């Protein structure tokens, strides 16, 4: 789900340079038959940590499995097929239910983005993963239909790992684009598309691949070729479905001219805790950074949705940098500078935050909402956690920190 390496600083360089030419911020895609027009505004949330596990979202699952379980691959390998299937089935059936979708709709949102791994549809030899996720994804589509929500299906993990992050299913070296991994990914994507794109009243978009890591070694030319293959698959099945394309941790405007006008939407992610400079900012600096990012994405010649972002400004959440990995904020990881204390923010509820922390979080969230709606909207990461203040929209809403209604502002015009 998230950017977890120091090369975020490289990406920041792309975002602070001025645009060489002005590009209209509301460039339109071609006329479409879809039930959602992505020239408009997306307001939604990710259903993270459900069908693709992440240690920081559900730390209890990983902590109960022992030290070796650091991602879904090692979790299932450690538990074995039978126990892993039992543990995950219990999680899938209880962590997210129809009531969550009703709450999301009642909060005023129009979209959910649902991550799914290739292993849910394409079992490969000698891999420990268990399947069974599609039954729950089927349920989610039905729940979204009843709630009046649109769905972006997000291929979140590819064979070999496209980014080396635990959210790809397997933490470690990036092996995607080696051997048959790209063709295997296309096969998995096609299986998802054939199953879900016919439900175009609800599934209005599908994402080619989450966070392929170009700064980390993924070939940009190879990624563009993969995107072309994916677009062909979608057009063969349902030409009315939009395709979300990750920017690969490059600037969105670096993709200008690529598949422009072809019903594609750029997906960019913005976090301010995985980089030593950004994590050092005070709240005024975080607000300015978010507003500046919103101005930068206006340079894209395609619709842009900020498909992941949060209210957090530190990396204090337990396991956020990886299971058992310490924090930048307290000077324990990737630097020797201490920026602050993680007291009350490692685990718990938004209610446990100080009044000032809640106020600052509200300011930061409002600034991002305004910034991202300057282009084509947003999908917050994530709906629910086991206790990660700043990341848990359900908890933020319940404690009055996430705006309700979504247009309510206690701190108006921050990006003016």
UniProtKB/Swiss-Prot annotation:
Presence of keyword Manganese: yes
Record-annotated active site: 211 (proton donor), 308 (nucleophile)
InterPro entries, per database record: Glyco_hydro_5, Glycoside_hydrolase_SF, Glycosyl_hydrolase_5
Cellular component aspect of the GO annotation: extracellular region
Signal peptide feature range: 1-22
Keywords annotated in UniProt: Carbohydrate metabolism, Cell wall biogenesis/degradation, Disulfide bond, Glycoprotein, Glycosidase, Hydrolase, Manganese, Metal-binding, Polysaccharide degradation, Secreted, Signal
GO terms for biological process, alphabetical: cell wall organization; glucan catabolic process
Biological role stated in the UniProt entry: Beta-glucanases participate in the metabolism of beta-glucan, the main structural component of the cell wall. It could also function biosynthetically as a transglycosylase.
Quaternary structure, from the entry: Monomer.
Protein name (database record): Probable glucan 1,3-beta-glucosidase A
Organism: Aspergillus fumigatus (strain ATCC MYA-4609 / CBS 101355 / FGSC A1100 / Af293)
Designated gene of the protein: exgA
């Amino acid at each position: 789900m998230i950017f977890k390496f120091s090369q975020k600083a490289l990406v920041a360089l792309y975002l602070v340079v001025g645009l060489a030419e002005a590009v209209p911020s509301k460039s339109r895609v071609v006329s479409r038959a879809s039930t959602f027009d992505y020239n408009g505004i997306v307001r939604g949330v990710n259903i993270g940590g459900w069908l693709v596990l992440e240690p920081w979202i559900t730390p209890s699952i990983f902590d109960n499995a022992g030290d070796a379980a650091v991602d879904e691959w090692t979790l299932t390998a450690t538990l074995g097929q039978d126990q892993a299937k039992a543990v995950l089935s219990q999680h899938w059936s209880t962590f997210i239910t129809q009531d969550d979708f009703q709450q999301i709709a009642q909060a005023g949102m129009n979209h959910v983005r649902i991550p799914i791994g290739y292993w849910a549809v394409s079992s490969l030899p000698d891999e420990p993963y268990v399947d069974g996720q599609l039954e729950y994804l089927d349920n989610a589509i039905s729940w979204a239909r009843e709630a009046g929500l649109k769905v972006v299906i997000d291929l979140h993990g590819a064979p070999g790992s496209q980014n080396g992050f635990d959210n790809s299913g397997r933490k470690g070296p990036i092996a995607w684009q080696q051997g048959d991994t790209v063709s295997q990914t296309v096969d998995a994507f096609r299986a998802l598309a054939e199953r879900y794109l016919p439900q175009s009243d609800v599934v209005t978009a599908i994402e080619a691949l989450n966070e392929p890591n170009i700064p980390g070694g993924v070939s940009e030319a190879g990624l563009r070729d993969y995107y072309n293959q994916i677009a062909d698959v979608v057009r063969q099945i349902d030409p009315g479905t939009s395709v979300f394309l990750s920017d690969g941790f490059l600037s969105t405007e670096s993709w200008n001219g690529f598949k422009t006008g072809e019903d594609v939407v750029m997906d960019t992610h913005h976090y301010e805790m995985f980089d030593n400079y950004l994590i050092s900012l005070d709240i005024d600096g975080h607000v300015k950074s978010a507003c500046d990012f919103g101005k930068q994405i206006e340079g894209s010649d395609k619709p842009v949705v900020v498909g992941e972002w949060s209210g957090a400004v530190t990396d204090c959440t337990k396991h956020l940098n990886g299971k058992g990995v310490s924090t930048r904020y307290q000077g324990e990881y990737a630097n020797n500078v201490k920026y602050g204390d993680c007291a009350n923010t490692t685990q718990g509820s938004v209610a446990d935050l100080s009044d000032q922390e809640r106020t600052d979080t509200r300011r930061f969230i409002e600034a991002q909402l305004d910034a991202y709606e300057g282009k084509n909207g947003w999908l917050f990461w994530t709906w629910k956690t086991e206790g990660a203040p700043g990341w848990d929209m359900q908890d933020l809403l319940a404690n009055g920190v996430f705006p309700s209604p979504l247009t309510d502002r206690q701190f108006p015009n921050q990006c003016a």
